[in-house]
From Swiss-Prot:
Protein name: Probable DNA-directed RNA polymerase subunit delta
NCBIfam families: RNAP_delt_lowGC
Pfam families with a match to the protein in the record: HARE-HTH
One Gene Ontology CC term in the entry: DNA-directed RNA polymerase complex
Amino acid sequence: MKLDVFAGQEISELSMIEVARAILEERGRDNDMYFSDLVNEIQNYLGKSDADIRYALPFFYTDLNTDGSFIPLGENKWGLRSWYAIDEIDEEIITLEDEEDGAPKRKKKRVNAFMDGDEDAIDYSADDPEDEDFVRESSDIEYDEEDPDDEKSEVESYDSELNEIIPEDDFEEVDLNEEDEEDEEEEE
C-alpha cells in the first residue's frame, strides 16, 4: 500500500493514528473500516511486528476514541468525522441499525489478539457470568409468617432456663415506690 500523503517522510516516524487517518481518507466515505481491518492495514504500511502492534494496540484505541477526527459507526466500524455533517451522524447510525433488523444476525467468531494460538492460555472471556442469562433459583427455605404460638413457646423456654439458674423462690419482691422514696431522701 502506498499513501501519497506521506511521500518523502520516514515511515518509522509516523504514528498509528496518522496512518489510520490517511488510510480512511484514501478509502473515502463509503468505505468505513472495521477496527481489526484498520489495524491490519496500519501494520502492513508501517511494517511493524505482531508484538509491536500488540503493545501499541491499547494506546492506539485510546487515541482513536479521544481524537476528534474519528467517529465510531457501530459494530466496531470507524470512519472520519469530516465525512458526516453534525445532523447526519445520528441518521447514519440509525440507518445502519434499521438495515440490520431485516436480516438474521450471524455470530462472528471472536478473535483475541493476545491469545497468539497458545492452547495453554486461559480465555477469561469464555466464562464471563454477564454473558449468561440470569436465572433465579428458588430457595429450599420457606419463611412462614410470624406465629404467635412460637413466640409463646420461646418465652416459656426462656423462663424455664432462668428458673434453672435462679429459682423463683429466691426472687425478692421490690416495690418500685419504695425505691423512689429512698432516692428522694438521698437527694435531700
